[in-house]
Design a protein with these regions (language model features):
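N-terminal Sec/ER secretory leader and immediately downstream segment
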Residues: 20-130
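Structured segments of extracytoplasmic/periplasmic soluble domains
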Residues: 87, 91-94, 98-101, 105, ...
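A cross-kingdom marker for long, charged
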Residues: 192-271
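Extended amphipathic alpha-helical interaction segments
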Residues: 122-218
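Bacterial N-terminal signal peptides
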Residues: 6-15
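Positively charged n-region of N-terminal signal peptides that target proteins for export
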Residues: 1-5
Length: 271
């Protein structure tokens, strides 16, 4: 019973940890967020939202449109907007790269746990289609300069949850087989070895990912500084706020959180 409970706990921990470590950390971790959906491509930077005003903002080559209307700008502001556009174009591929690594860490952890418990690399490979689905979604969105927070988060969570459910089924079968055939010691040896190896590899990847995220924060802060320097004001006198400040940066999400949760739960199953 304890073994089966650990299997269920593992799937829940993995799903929760993976979802929380999703791509949204790149802005929240820095203490910035945006209320807009964003598209960045060669034609410019388009920001849209359904609630609040302005609803649409478009930047390109030093020009600004707000709710479809071209805005008068000083030459200094035009230059700042060019720099903001260039910064956004440099930022989006890096956000996509970080998101891909988060997906990689998450599903490597899933696969490692499945193989350690079941002793079957073929069963571990069965969850690869969920990794492929998550990466394909990244390619269709962030990979093309498109960021829509709510749909993106839901899709990422769905891929992770589906993999967690499938993994739980494989683990349940593996644990039951080991329990009834007297091979629990083999499972324990595999999970011990897996835990040590995964700790080492995921720690290194987690530190590298954290460094990339911190560098991303520097780029976001530079964009915010340019926005704060704009002399332009919206009709009514308000500043243009494309980036919003939180009171303080959110606690950085551990990039290897899913791996650590998975290995800890898997280790408990062998005892």
């Amino acid at each position: 019973m304890r073994l089966l409970l650990s299997v269920c706990t593992l799937s829940l921990l993995a799903a929760a940890a993976s979802a929380s470590a999703g791509p949204q950390f790149s802005s929240q971790q820095c203490g910035f967020s945006t209320p807009y959906d964003v598209i960045v491509d060669r034609t410019g930077v388009a920001l849209t939202r359904s609630a609040g005003t302005p609803k649409t903002v478009f930047l390109h080559d030093g020009r600004l449109q707000v709710d479809g209307v071209a805005q008068p700008l000083s030459s200094a502001d035009a230059q700042r907007l060019r720099q903001m556009e260039q910064g956004a174009q440099a930022l989006m591929p890096e956000v996509a790269g970080i998101a891909r690594e988060v997906v990689g860490i998450t599903f490597d952890a899933f696969g490692g746990v499945v193989e350690a418990i079941t002793g079957s690399s073929s069963k571990a490979r069965k969850i690869e289609r969920h990794r492929d689905a998550a990466l394909a979604h990244l390619d269709r969105t962030l990979g093309k300069g498109q960021w829509q927070k709510e749909p993106f988060d839901k899709a990422f969570e769905a891929d992770v949850s589906a993999a967690a459910e499938e993994m739980a089924g494989a683990l349940t079968s593996g644990v039951m087989f080991a329990a009834f055939t007297g091979r629990a010691d083999d499972v324990e040896k595999r999970t011990d070895a897996m835990e040590k190896d995964m700790d080492r590899r995921m720690d290194a990847r987690g530190k590298a990912l954290e460094a990339r995220a911190n560098a991303l924060c520097v780029q976001v802060a530079a964009l915010d500084a340019l926005e704060q320097q704009l002399d332009y004001r919206l009709p009514g006198g308000k500043r243009l706020d494309l980036l919003e400040h939180s009171d303080k940066p959110a606690k950085p999400a551990a990039p290897d959180e899913a791996a650590m949760a998975a290995t800890a739960a898997a280790h408990s199953q062998a005892h």
